[in-house]
Amino acid sequence: KKIINDAGVIVLSDAWLGGGFASKTKCIRNPNDAKGQVMRAAGKAFNQMLEGAGAGIQSMPSSEIYTGLQTGVLTGANTSSGSFVSYKIYEQVKCATPPGKFGLWFMYEPILMSKQNFEALNSKQQKALMKAGKVAEKYMTEQVANLDKKFEDAYRAAGVELAYMTAEDHAAWVEIAKKTSHKAFAEKVPGMALIHITT
């Protein structure tokens, strides 16, 4: 949040959306399953981790995953639960790994406002905005579980196999992340202690 603040922006509401994997070839539960796959991942840190697991990376927006899988440019992808459903990726894959109990991927989706605009408001308006932000945050937290369920339901209905990570699978990804994305993150942001707390 300090980085956001320093950029002249205020966070009105926090939200974290879950996501997972899908593949044309096999279920992706652990790093060994990603080895040799050509993946689209959501963000630099996840790219670093997948490369560390032996996957090839193709960068593209989530709106192009369907075509990437259809044309053979990709064998697998990582994106949010919502995108997995809205882009009908279930039409192109054999197996999907929803967040489940040991979700690996989360996307930060805050509601932001320019600090300059916020500070131009009077105290009453500022309080009202912050209160509305908390209401939005509570609502979004409740909806996240619904997005994950829609992901599972849509893929099950399409006949796609669903796979779930175990604690051991999750731990194997964390070990790869420590050598790749965590290391790169710590070089830019002094947050390694926080990463260790969460893993």
Residue ranges of predicted features:
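N-terminal secretory/targeting leader peptides
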Residues: 2-199
